Amino acid sequence: MFNFTRQYSVKDGLITDELASHIVENLPARYASAETWKRIYSLQHDGASLQTMYLACEKEKARSGHPKGACILAVRDTDGDVFGVFIPDYLIPAPHYFGSEETFLWKYFPPKKYVHYPFVGNSNFVAYCTKSFLAFGGGNGRYSLWLDGSLEYAYSSRTPAFENNPLSYRGCPDQRIQIVDIELWVLE
């Protein structure tokens, strides 16, 4: 069994021990050894606001004193599927794409199936944070994962950046995904 320290109780959270063990298998070595996974934002506890999530990142960046932070974003849809992204950066609005080849997408759905989509480098569109939306992957006019500013819905399509299938298991490309919960974690 995978062992890591959680700063918050997450028995009602999205990242279970089993899901965490799958994610760790794909993390770069320097992040896989992180001793603490700290949940800094939860839609259920902090409200449905992209700005609140960005503010949590800014506060964590100031607290840690590190210019970069390793983040895991987890999203649950109305079908109960959980999907998200690992990115070795804080999610803070920027006027351009950012991120690195260490970024990856993942999805986890019943019966406990985990799928990993590494960055394949066919575009430089890794992450894009604006005040009105948050997006990962890009190309051909689509995003691998796009979340609206109210965090009520998302879209997921195949892009050259990750060559992923839609992240919502029951979703189709360009179909609106209704969001039930979102969590943002930082690894320390």
UniProtKB/Swiss-Prot annotation:
One of its GO terms (molecular function) is ATPase inhibitor activity. It is found in: Mitochondrion; Cytoplasm; Nucleus. InterPro entries: TLDc_dom. Keywords: Cytoplasm, Meiosis, Mitochondrion, Nucleus. Residues 13-188 form the TLDc domain. One of its GO terms (biological process) is regulation of cellular pH. May be involved in protection from oxidative damage. Has a role in meiosis. This is Oxidation resistance protein 1. It comes from Schizosaccharomyces pombe (strain 972 / ATCC 24843).
